[in-house]
Amino acid sequence: MSAFSYTIMCNFAHNQLFLRMKKPLKRITIAVVSALLLLLVAGSFFMTTYALKAHSNRVEQQEDTWRIMSERYPDLKWWFDSVRQHRALNDTTIEMPSKYRAHAYYMRAPKPTTNTAIVVHGYKENALKMLHLAKMYSDWGYNVLLPDLYAHGLSEGEYIQMGWKDRFDVMRWSEVANDLFRSSTANSQQVLHGVSMGAATVMCVSGETTPSYVRCFVEDCGYTDVWSEFKSELKNQFSLPAFPLLYTSSWLTDLRWGWNFKEASPLEAVKRSTKPMLFIHGGNDSFVPTPMVYELYKAKKGVKKLLVVPNATHARSFAVANNDYKNTVKQFIEEQN
């Protein structure tokens, strides 16, 4: 056998061996990629369910809230007990344009007035968690409306909307509040006050065209956008980067519920806002990182004010600096009337 023929035979044998090895290698590669994709999809389903699934027993949660509020604000326990005993909170339920039943509590001022506060609760909480602020406004002679957001409290719904689609519901509640509290000669004069996700909600409302009776907004520890908030939580709670899980989870949320994490942006809404806004944040907030409030404040054009409470963690500014909180809010809203 010549050297040339031997070389040809060796090359042929090598190629055959390579082809035989290539097929299982290809199958292994496909299997690994498929497994990774399935794991990613499963992780995305878990994340969206973990982050957006409503409280499993919201009726039981309502009962617990009375106890929690009394423990959190012991100086106000007497008022909470009085409100409950005398049934000072009225219930109202309406059908939203999206065809779900939404619930709210409302309380009339001690004396007839058109001054009205709509106070919006936070993530996985309910309207009763805003009773401390309801008392604050009631003491100032305001009517108060406390809505349960979609998939919270006594409202229908299974998955949380992080304040984004909730903006339309709060705008509807604003109309309801005006019907409830306007006088025979004048509309109500409303302040929209939100805490945490509720703050994100009222900021999203501020970017829409609102009636003249909506006078101003107070946002307490709201986030810049859902993407940034979830990115922060992925890092802090799970030590995970944004890629790829946050991307696929946002896509899955869009597929299932028609919105994504980046478009749900209070920051972009604030840029469009034309009405006065008070920004409040805890100086030691790690859940919604404190630097977010500076970005929001900078983006707001027109009348604005900022209160950062030193040492306050998430949604604890009212408890940590009670007098400063109340004085700042009162002065701000009085300046808008």
Residues covered by each model-derived region:
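Short beta-strand/loop motif that positions the catalytic acidic residue
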Residues: 273, 279-281, 285
